[in-house]
């Protein structure tokens, strides 16, 4: 399957979860947030959320301000 991960085109296996994709890419970061197709996916759902062909995935660091 073809996806965009942080604006980079890449291939991933069919049926792969977000958690598995992040493990494969060594992208396990505390304080990170993830959006798929411009919708935030809560960390609790990463292990169940299946990546779909054409998904646009953004992983970014959450920064607190004040």
UniProtKB/Swiss-Prot annotation:
GO terms for biological process: thiamine biosynthetic process; thiamine diphosphate biosynthetic process; thiazole biosynthetic process. C-terminal thiocarboxylation occurs in 2 steps, it is first acyl-adenylated (-COAMP) by ThiF, then thiocarboxylated (-COSH) by ThiI. Pathway: Cofactor biosynthesis; thiamine diphosphate biosynthesis. The keyword Phosphoprotein applies. The modification Glycyl adenylate is found at residue 66. The keyword Membrane does not apply. The modification 1-thioglycine is found at residue 66. CDD domains: Ubl_ThiS. One of its GO terms (cellular component) is adenylyltransferase complex. One of its GO terms (molecular function) is sulfur carrier activity. It comes from the Bacteria. Keywords: Nucleotide-binding, Phosphoprotein, Thiamine biosynthesis, Thioester bond. There is a cross-link at residue 66 (Glycyl cysteine dithioester (Gly-Cys) (interchain with C-184 in ThiF)). NCBIfam families: thiS. Belongs to the sulfur carrier protein ThiS family. PANTHER family: SULFUR CARRIER PROTEIN THIS. Is the sulfur donor in the synthesis of the thiazole phosphate moiety of thiamine phosphate. This is Sulfur carrier protein ThiS. It comes from Escherichia coli (strain K12). The gene is thiS.
């Amino acid at each position: 399957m073809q996806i965009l991960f942080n604006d980079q085109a890449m291939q991933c296996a069919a049926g792969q979860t977000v958690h598995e994709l992040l493990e494969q890419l060594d992208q396990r970061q505390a304080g990170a947030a993830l959006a798929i197709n411009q919708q935030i996916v809560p960390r609790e759902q990463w292990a169940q959320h299946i990546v779909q062909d054409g998904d646009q995935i953004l992983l970014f660091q959450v920064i607190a301000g004040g």
